[in-house]
Amino acid sequence: MALATTIEKFGSLSDHELLRVKELMLTVWPKATFYTFEYLDWLYRLNPAGKAETFNVWKGNSIVGHYAAIPIVANLFGHEERGLLSLNSVVHPDYQGRGYFKSLALSTYEEAKLRNAGFVIGVANAKSTLPCQRQLKFQKVSPLTVKLGFGHVKRKTEPSASPCFNVKWEEANLDWRLKRPGANYRVTSNSSGTWLWGGTGTHGIYAEMGWFPTEARQLSSVLSQVDAMSTIKSNPVKLWIGLDQRCEWPGYWYCVLPERFKPSPLNFLFKDLTNFKRFLDPETAQISLLDFDAY
């Protein structure tokens, strides 16, 4: 008799469960070799904001469907609030088309609400954006800006409006984020602040992960552990992906990357888990590569 499938909360996030998730991910995405046990352990179990919220579809001793979101803390409409970053959604090819994506995600959100999660954010490619909007009622806040150029991107010291959303980085979660297995980070600094750069996998091109103003002294001890890039000129080509109204683009050698060259994901998504029906303003929402697990 064929084994039935069951949807279950991840449980204890045991080694056995992580290994089954890794097997599923590499079955569906065989080229995504960064999905190692060490990476999932770091992502799901070591986050100082809390362990991942996850649900699985089990078939016997195998996981054939998986959804995961990790806890984050953000400044949302002027107040600090706990929420989720939606990261991994995968269903084995033999079990696709059965509604597992929607049921796994909604089960995860309901569970997270019990722990005071007030929102979910995500960054999705064009293929994934529409199901998130239709089935999970996400707001498509904005396509991310993608630019390629040279040098530092300067920020305005006094932006025209306060951000309606930005992820809150403190010593503990920044230290954890910088320990992403397999990552290659560098820093450069000047009088206005510190830039964090991540390797893109393309020789000679680094991506700006985030920028920290000089006033963020509480993070300096964490950033000082990252190797300094000898000079900004030693790796001149830079990739910028995100949303940030503080960026002063005029006068800098950055150009918008044509659509056919853009890396995925590209759309910033938001879902309110409260009853207040909140939506983000794309003109003041901020998100950087550091805020989601791209590099």
Where are these regions (language model features)?
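Short, high-confidence coil segments that cap the C-terminus of an alpha-helix
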Residues: 52, 114-117, 183, 231-237
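Catalytic micro-motifs at enzyme active sites that drive phosphoryl/nucleotidyl and oxygen chemistry
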Residues: 44-45, 71-77, 109
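Conserved acetyl-CoA-binding loop-helix of GNAT-fold acetyltransferases
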Residues: 91, 96-110, 216-229
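Amide-forming acyltransferase catalytic core, primarily the GNAT-like/NAT-type
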Residues: 21, 25-26, 32-48, 58, ...
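Active-site/acyl-donor-binding loops of N-acyltransferases
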Residues: 119-162, 201-295
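A short beta-loop-alpha structural element at the N-terminal edge
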Residues: 6-21
